Regions:
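Divalent metal-coordination and catalytic microenvironments
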Residues: 4, 89, 133, 175, ...
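C-terminal cap of metal-dependent C-N hydrolases
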Residues: 37, 120-127, 132-133, 137, ...
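Short linear motifs in exposed loops
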Residues: 95, 240-241, 255
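Acidic, glycine-enriched loop/beta-strand segments at the rims
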Residues: 107-113, 119, 167-176, 184-221
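Short, solvent-exposed cationic patches
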Residues: 252-260
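Feature captures the catalytic cores and cofactor-binding loops of soluble hydro-lyases/lyases
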Residues: 137, 145, 149, 157-169, ...
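Active-site neighborhoods of metal-dependent hydrolases
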Residues: 1-168
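Alpha-helical structural signal
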Residues: 93-97, 180-183, 248
Length: 260
């Protein structure tokens, strides 16, 4: 059995996913129409106050929910729901509903919903793999907008530099295995994850004494430190910390336990 994690205590989701599931029946348009109804908002307010309502996970405060991306400018990235409600002089739930409507349901948030103690315990667990749970991004163009989760830039350097090297929760080989060989085995990718004859030449050259994430919640669009060269399918794509322009990556599909 395997589990996986990203080494952060904040999660990310669409803002509307915090609301009761019945609101989403019929799609986004139906959700937005319902949220404009004061009676529906009253029902939501009652529901989220119930013991056991778990859409909010372990969220203790509206200050633990901050805007990550607001495609239509409904709210400023980095501001918390508590901030927005105070500035608009309204109830926090009304602020949530108003932002969702103005952004047509596309607002994404960061949510402090996990414990750092749990993050550390899972990082040290031999059965836990590591992944970013996010898309490829860059600090320019359309993906350089807003304040997305720092895991998009820093997941792997953070595990190596912070949790393995600085905190000593696991060894360097253990940390690397979680994101390479062990992950490839779990996913059934037969020719990936190891430095061996017959394996695809996917290689990252880094300095173990300096590698670290630099992406933060307030300033997420930051590349990590300590990585000099990246090779994908035998082609150098990062050289001296700069992209070469090469795009040798390809889609990997699993068929059973053998990569086709």
């Amino acid at each position: 059995m395997h589990g996986d994690q990203y080494p952060y205590d904040w999660a990310t989701n669409p803002l509307r996913f915090l609301l009761p599931t019945w609101l989403h029946e019929g799609g986004v348009s139906a959700t937005l129409e319902r949220l404009a109804d004061p009676y529906v908002r009253a029902r939501i307010r009652q529901k989220i106050a119930e013991v056991g309502f778990n859409n909010f996970g372990q969220i203790d405060s509206w200050a633990d929910i901050r805007i990550a991306i607001s495609p239509r400018g409904a709210a400023e990235p980095g501001r918390t729901i508590e901030d927005i409600a105070r500035e608009r002089r309204c109830d926090p739930l009304d602020a949530v509903c108003d932002v969702i409507i103005a952004d047509k349901g596309a607002t994404r948030i960061l949510v402090r919903s996990m414990s750092e103690a749990d993050v550390r315990a899972i990082a040290a667990d031999p059965s836990a793999l590591v992944g970013s749970d996010g898309p490829c991004v860059a600090p320019y163009g359309i993906t350089g907008q807003g304040k997305p989760h720092p895991r998009l830039y820093g997941t792997f350097p953070r595990l190596i530099g912070h949790y393995a090297r600085d905190l000593g929760l696991l060894t360097l080989p253990q940390a690397i295995a979680k994101m390479t060989g062990a992950a490839a085995v779990a996913l059934g990718l037969a020719d990936r994850g190891l430095l061996a004859e017959g394996q695809a030449a996917d290689v990252v050259l880094f300095d173990p004494t300096t590698i670290i994430d630099r992406s933060t919640y307030d300033d997420p669009h930051q590349y990590p430190a300590g990585i000099g060269t990246v090779i994908v399918n035998g082609t150098v794509v990062i050289d001296g910390g700069e992209h070469t322009g090469a795009l040798p990556g390809r889609l990997l599909r699993r068929r059973g336990t053998v990569l086709a």
